[in-house]
C-alpha cells in the first residue's frame, strides 16, 4: 500500500490509465504473448512521473508469465504513444510493469485450505 495519501486527481488519472492500457492491449497490440494479460491496477507516484502497472495472466504455465512480461516490455513504447494520443494530461508517466501475484497467492491459499480439509476428514 502506498505511504502517501492519494489525491482525487491522482486516483482519477490512475483509473484512466488502467482503462486505456487495458483497451490498448485488446484493440491495438497484436502480440500473442499478451492475449490473456489483464491489467489489475495502477499505482502512480505523487508527481505523476511513474506509473506502476500491475498485471496478471490467467495461465498455470510459468513460461506464460515470462513471455507476457517480455511482451509488455516490447509493447511499452507503443502503449505509451497510444496513451499520449488518448489522454489530456501534460505528461505521460514512465510505465513500469509489475506482475500482480495476488490472484496466484489466493489460489495457493485455497489449495492449502482444501488440502487441510481433505486431510482432516
Curated annotation (Swiss-Prot):
It comes from the Bacteria. One of its GO terms (cellular component) is cytosol. One of its GO terms (biological process) is maturation of SSU-rRNA. Coiled coil: none annotated. The keyword Cytoplasm applies. InterPro entries: KH_dom-like_a/b (IPR015946), RbfA (IPR000238), RbfA_dom_sf (IPR023799). It is found in: Cytoplasm. Its main location: cytoplasm. The keyword NAD does not apply. Keywords: Cytoplasm, Ribosome biogenesis. GO terms for molecular function: ribosomal small subunit binding. One of several proteins that assist in the late maturation steps of the functional core of the 30S ribosomal subunit. Associates with free 30S ribosomal subunits (but not with 30S subunits that are part of 70S ribosomes or polysomes). Required for efficient processing of 16S rRNA. May interact with the 5'-terminal helix region of 16S rRNA. Monomer. Binds 30S ribosomal subunits, but not 50S ribosomal subunits or 70S ribosomes. PANTHER family: RIBOSOME-BINDING FACTOR A, CHLOROPLASTIC-RELATED. Belongs to the RbfA family. This is Ribosome-binding factor A. The lineage of its organism: Bacteria, Bacillati, Bacillota, Bacilli, Lactobacillales.
